[in-house]
Amino acid sequence: MQREALVAALEREGFAALVTVTREPGALDEHTHPFEAKALILSGEIHLRIGDDERCYRAGDVFHLPAHLPHAERYGPAGVHYPVGRK
């Protein structure tokens, strides 16, 4: 998926304007967000752990997190960069 396609899809799904996130290598312990999030990885990688399940998302992958879902984040050796829609 390209950035333009993501923007169009998010608008159709009622997400607010995109926010661009850049994270350095590292991690965030388990936490939640008060919003639903859908993002397209542009560079780097992010590992999302939900319960015992961990998935890795790399450039070109899209991840979707419901609001209030406990999860942990770990960023690859080059960090991660992605636009994300929130609602």
Residue ranges of predicted features:
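Short acidic-glycine-tyrosine-enriched beta hairpin
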Residues: 51-68
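Short, conserved beta-strand element in jelly-roll/cupin
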Residues: 32-48
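Conserved short histidine dyad/triad with adjacent acidic residue
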Residues: 16-33, 67-68
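Ligand-binding loop in jelly-roll beta-barrel domains
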Residues: 67-87
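Short, charged/polar surface micro-motifs in flexible loops or helix N-caps
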Residues: 25-26, 43-46, 54
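N-terminal acidic leader/helix
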Residues: 8-13
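Fe(II)/2-oxoglutarate oxygenase catalytic core
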Residues: 1-2
